Amino acid sequence: IDWKTCSWGWDSRRKADSMTTYQLVLYKHFFAIKHNIDPKNIVTHFALLKRTAKKNRVEIFKVTSGAKKTENCLKLLNKAIYNIKKKRHIKNRLACTQGFGCEFFNTQFCSR
């Protein structure tokens, strides 16, 4: 179980978001390797601790992580590691604002 705090909970889109669920997929994968456990015997869940909800302040939902999802997740992780090692960084141009965004805005390190 991975415990998360939130205000009202997550909508179905957030619960199904691959980048959110890949976190638990990786936990399961590496836990299974470390402890020599068959991944089929491990079940993963998110537990949402809702700060402002009046009722049902804790919501627990299962995150599925079969072989194909694990393969896709590891492929994405390996691509990210490769690009980081090759110094291929993606520029977030939406963060190029003075004051609230990139700390390198209009400095010698800015390639905007």
Model-derived regions: residue spans:
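Non-catalytic protein-protein interaction segments used by genome-maintenance enzymes to assemble
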Residues: 1-24
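Metal-dependent nuclease catalytic regions and adjoining charged, substrate-binding loops involved
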Residues: 29-112
